[in-house]
Amino acid sequence: MHPDPAPGPTTSPTTSPTTVPLRSERLDLLPIAPEHAGELAAALADPALHTFTGGHPATPEEMRARCARLAAGSPDPAEQWGNWVLRLRADGALTGYVQATVGPDEAELAWVVGTPWQRRGLATEAARTLLAHLAATGTTTAVAHIHPDHHASAAIARALGLHPTPHTHDGETRWQATLPRPTPTT
């Protein structure tokens, strides 16, 4: 089991903001690693999760390759990839993931929670923790691209303070929010 870190974001000058573990009220957000592949593939095995995003449930082997690629980080030095699996502390279940593609001022967010754990507020809780972490590390704008018929993701975006814009990309609406600037510590 993991030691209990303090709630909220923590980084040091030598730690990338996209590779630190995070903690919310009920979840440990752990940087993605290939060893999460089997649990993550099982958690996300419901084909209904792909209704709005396309694709199919990944096999454990496909998920291992994906986790390794994501853990390696972006090949573009102008952006960082942050990918965290969500571990429910109450029972240890790996329930999904959140991710952020972080550029100089903007982070694009995504969240997926497996069907058995939906409607419990876990995606909102995890994404809110991620947003607080990104704001604390200097990100000023958060965006998410959401299919117009994906009402559950739109509700999460609203709960996070994101608002739909008139812009679309690949048929998805761009949602956006300005994040608060970090408060300087003295």
Q: Where does each model-flagged region fall?
A:
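Catalytic cores of transferase enzymes with a strong primary signal for eukaryotic protein kinases
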Residues: 55-57, 146-150, 154-157
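Conserved acetyl-CoA-binding loop-helix of GNAT-fold acetyltransferases
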Residues: 119-136, 151-159
